[in-house]
Amino acid sequence: MAKNYYEITLALAGICQSAHVVQQLAHTGHCNNDVLHTSLNSVLNLNPSSTLAVYGNDEQNLKVGLETLLGILNTSSNKGAGAELSRYAFSLIALERKLKAKPAALDELGKRIGQLERQLEHFDLLSETIVSALAAIYVDVISTLGPRIQVTGSPEVLKNSQVQAKVRSALLAGIRSAVLWQQIGGGRLQLMFSRGQLVKEAKQILARCPSV
């Protein structure tokens, strides 16, 4: 069956958007709240009607992720900010493979995310309560699967518990996009042999996103 590179590109952009958020938080302690909201909200949509629905049914919501994806696909450097983003993205994809191999962990992940619905009746998605709950899911379910993702940035910034929680919640969102990517036919060979197709799709989607 022919691959749907549009949907595959959207899910990859979701992974890359999470990587971007992690990088911004780790270095500055801040990130764009709209971008973070799109990423965290994707975790909650476990039965989407489409790939785009995971990201709020709006390509514009993935603009940062698409730009980050293009940067990763077009870079050959193994140093600097681009290399850091690549490492986060590929680490998330590797962790998703470990998650897929452990059905009990997948079940626990779904159960814990489902339990958030009650809290969301009382707290905003970006509230400290919900972000901390998402971070706890990442620590309890994902961090136990294998080598932890090494987040690099400002040591002072990374000491902040709220920044730590946002970083972990963003990593959880990256895992969600990696799961989606695999479900719709994504695979690591595409990143080597279908880069041109992915770049083309990402550019076409970005061309439809209005400049802000």
From Swiss-Prot:
It is a peripheral membrane protein. InterPro entries: HflD, HflD-like_sf. Belongs to the HflD family. Coiled coil: none annotated. It is found in: Cytoplasm; Cell inner membrane. Its main location: cytoplasm. It holds the Pfam family DUF489. The keyword Membrane applies. PANTHER family: HIGH FREQUENCY LYSOGENIZATION PROTEIN HFLD (PTHR38100:SF1). HAMAP family: HflD_protein. This is High frequency lysogenization protein HflD homolog. It comes from the Bacteria. GO terms for cellular component: cytoplasm; plasma membrane. The lineage of its organism: Bacteria, Pseudomonadati, Pseudomonadota, Gammaproteobacteria, Enterobacterales. Keywords: Cell inner membrane, Cell membrane, Cytoplasm, Membrane.
